[in-house]
Every structure is written in structure tokens, then in C-alpha cells.
């Protein structure tokens, strides 16, 4: 019997009706000859009683600082409740199931509370239930340190749980259930005509996820890519075949699909800020790379970096603006920060080596009076920095330009 991982997101487990649909997916997998290992997120989204954001709000309302260790213990509760409820639903439908915490499933992590990394999975803890034909319903998002402290894997960490279990248990594939029919060519809230991408390469989906598409966590893609573990993005609320994420070459049949052109998709990230450090006439105590090294030490991630003889230009998360400004002021640097920016990225392995794609993007945006403040490209992506007020229009323009 082939083992599969089925991960259900917060919307999929939010109500009795939704959970019944999820249970049908699990039962259907068993009827098709698969053995499902289930991973669940916390119930619902922000504002609902057991959602992660709601639990964080509870802690913040106390007005007292909660340690990272204790915060992880608190916010892991949502997944525990969800696992117990889902296991109960399965048992009520005649499927022998058991709820397991991250610890009970053998997910061992480091002690980087709030964003822990999985060190290993002690698979015997899951296999002993599989051997009894009992479906494990495992809490996503959480693990445990060597010393027994509960940890969480960061925002979207249930995807990571599904991927590490798939890798450790040598699963046939991982199925990620959400509320859309698969990975779309663009955000369907912006592009009504956005299409489902039926198949996509690991690298492309990693770039899409890293650039703002919220269908799957980029770390989950990295884990799957290392072991060639297929991932399928599916809709709990439909029978759409979804999007399959695998490794394939340029000349594979999957790249010849009629609904795909030069690009695979478009993603965007809001709340970016552009930092310009001016070196004309000297610049305080900065030795060049020193500031970038210091930002890394501070845990501030930089993006879209361009280095010139007279200036450095890069972007940071808008939440980091004040810390960046303080550092530059301490170093007596000449600098400016442009806030309220968004990064819009086009993704596609087939743009590699194709001349004129950047020029085509800039022409299309210019025709629509969208100012571009910065660009960056790699072998599979081209990104532009625009004002946030122009980001939606930029996505629309580029989606139309490349006929996605």
C-alpha cells in the first residue's frame, strides 16, 4: 500500500461541513489503495477562537512579555485542538484514527522558538500506528526539542510538517488541501481570468512562493525537491485535479501544455522599502560591506540588491525600516528610505537565456504609467519594485502582456 501525506489548511478544517469534505478526501484516498497520514492546521483564520493569530493576540493582551518558549507552547494549541477534532470525525465515520502532537509523531527540532528547523523525524512513532491500520492525524506547525520543549516551525509551518513527514516516511506524494483549485497564474483576487497551472517545476514554485504566492511554504518545496517528493496542491471544496509539483526538464511534455506561455506565473510582495546608501564624497564610518554584514547579524533580510560605485540600493521588509534607519544613523551614513513599495515578480524557467524579456516588461509598465524604481533578475525570475498603489495594476498589465 502506498503511503501519502494529506495536509488540510485552516479553512479546510474550520467548520463541520468543511471537515466532512476533508474526511471524504481521506476516505477516498483509502478506497484508491493509499494509506493516508493526515496533517492539520489550526482551525480557521484570524479572529476565530483557535486560529494562531487569535492565540497570539491573547498573549499580547496580557500586557506582559511572554517568552518565546512559552509563546510556542501557547500558539501550538490550535493545531492540537484541530487534530483531536479531525481524528474524532474520522472515527465517527468508521476510520480508525489517532491524534498525535508533533512530539508524539517524533518531529525533533532545534530550539529556535517561533521558527524552528526540523532535525529529524523518529518515524517509528508514526509507523506503529500505520502497522495497526490506524490513520495518524498529526498536528502541523509544531515539533519538540531534544529536551521536550514544544516548538513551532514559523508561519505556514504545517506545509513544512507535511513535507518532512513525506520525506521521512518515503511517501508516494504530499497533497496540500486549500480553498483554491491549485497554483494560479496570478492572484485570482486581482486577475479574474487567472488559470490553474496543472504542472510546475520545484524551482518555479519555490520562486513563486518566495515572491509572495501563498499557496505553499517555500521551505516545504525545498524539502520536497531534495528527495524528488511530488507535491499536489488540491481544493478541499472541489474535485479539480489541482497542480502537481515535480522535477521536469525543459523538453518534457508537461512544458508543452497549451495554457502556459513564456512565463509560469506572477507573484507580488507588499510592504517593501527601498534603501539607498549614497557614497558620493565618502559616507561616515561605513566600509561598504560592513553595513550589509551588520544587517545580516541583526536578522534583517535584504533583497533586490544593486551595488554601484557611488551607492548601494536594496530592499527590506517594511517592518525593518526603523532598525535599518537607526543603524545607518549610528554609522553617520547618507541614506534615503522609500516606503510603501511592492515587489512584483514574473516567474518561468523558460525565460532563461531569452533576450528582451526585461525590456518587454519595462515597456508594458511604462505604457501604463507605472514607475519602476528598481529591477532584478535571475535565471528564472524578473522582479520590479513599484509603489504599492501601482502593484495591482502592474500584475494586471503583465498578466495580459504575456497572455498567461
Model-inferred region functions:
Residues 34, 95, 229, 300, ...:
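Short phosphate-binding/catalytic loops that engage adenosine nucleotides
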Residues 43-44, 180-182, 229-231, 235-240, ...:
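Glycine-rich beta-alpha junction loops
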Residues 173-177, 231-233, 303:
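Short hydrophobic alpha-helical runs that function as membrane-insertion/retention elements
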Residues 224:
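Acidic-aromatic/histidine active-site loop/patch
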Residues 243-404:
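A conserved regulatory-domain signal marking ACT and ACT-like small-molecule sensing domains
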Amino acid at each position: 500500500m502506498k503511503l501519502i501525506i494529506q495536509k488540510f489548511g485552516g479553512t479546510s478544517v474550520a467548520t463541520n461541513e468543511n471537515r466532512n469534505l476533508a474526511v471524504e478526501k481521506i476516505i477516498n484516498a483509502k478506497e484508491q489503495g493509499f494509506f493516508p497520514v493526515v496533517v492539520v492546521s489550526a482551525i480557521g483564520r484570524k479572529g476565530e477562537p483557535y486560529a494562531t493569530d487569535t492565540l497570539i493576540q491573547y498573549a499580547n493582551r496580557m500586557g506582559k512579555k511572554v517568552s518565546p518558549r512559552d509563546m510556542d507552547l501557547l500558539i501550538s494549541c490550535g493545531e492540537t485542538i484541530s487534530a483531536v477534532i479531525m481524528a474524532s470525525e474520522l472515527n465517527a465515520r468508521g476510520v480508525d484514527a489517532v491524534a498525535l502532537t508533533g512530539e508524539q509523531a517524533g518531529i525533533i527540532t532545534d530550539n529556535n522558538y517561533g521558527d524552528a528547523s526540523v532535525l529529524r523525524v523518529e518515524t517509528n512513532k508514526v509507523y506503529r500506528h500505520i502497522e495497526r491500520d490506524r490513520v495518524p492525524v498529526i498536528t502541523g506547525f509544531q515539533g519538540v526539542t531534544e529536551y521536550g520543549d514544544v516548538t513551532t516551525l514559523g508561519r505556514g509551518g504545517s506545509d513544512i510538517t507535511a513535507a518532512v513527514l513525506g520525506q521521512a516516511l518515503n511517501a508516494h506524494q504530499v497533497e496540500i488541501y486549500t480553498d483554491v483549485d491549485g497554483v494560479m497564474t496570478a492572484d485570482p483576487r486581482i486577475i479574474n481570468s487567472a488559470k490553474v497551472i496543472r504542472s510546475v517545476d520545484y524551482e518555479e514554485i519555490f520562486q513563486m512562493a518566495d515572491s509572495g504566492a501563498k499557496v505553499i511554504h517555500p521551505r516545504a518545496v525545498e524539502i520536497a525537491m531534495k528527495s524528488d517528493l511530488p507535491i499536489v496542491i488540491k481544493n478541499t471544496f472541489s474535485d479539480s485535479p489541482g497542480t502537481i509539483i515535480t522535477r521536469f526538464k525543459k523538453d518534457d511534455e508537461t512544458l508543452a501544455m497549451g495554457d502556459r506561455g513564456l512565463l509560469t506565473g506572477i507573484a507580488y510582495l507588499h510592504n517593501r522599502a527601498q534603501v539607498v546608501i549614497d557614497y558620493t564624497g565618502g559616507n561616515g564610518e561605513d566600509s561598504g560591506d560592513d553595513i550589509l554584514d551588520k544587517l545580516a547579524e541583526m536578522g534583517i533580510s535584504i533583497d533586490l540588491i544593486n551595488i554601484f560605485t557611488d551607492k548601494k540600493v536594496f530592499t527590506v521588509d517594511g517592518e525593518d525600516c526603523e532598525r535599518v534607519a537607526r543603524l545607518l544613523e549610528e554609522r553617520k551614513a547618507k541614506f534615503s528610505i522609500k516606503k510603501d513599495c511592492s515587489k512584483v515578480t514574473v516567474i518561468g524557467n523558460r525565460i532563461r537565456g531569452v533576450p528582451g524579456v526585461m525590456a518587454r516588461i519595462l515597456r508594458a509598465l511604462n505604457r501604463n504609467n507605472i514607475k519602476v524604481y528598481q529591477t532584478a533578475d535571475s535565471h528564472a525570475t524578473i522582479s520590479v519594485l513599484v509603489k504599492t498603489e501601482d502593484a495591482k495594476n502592474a500584475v494586471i498589465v503583465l498578466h495580459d502582456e504575456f497572455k498567461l
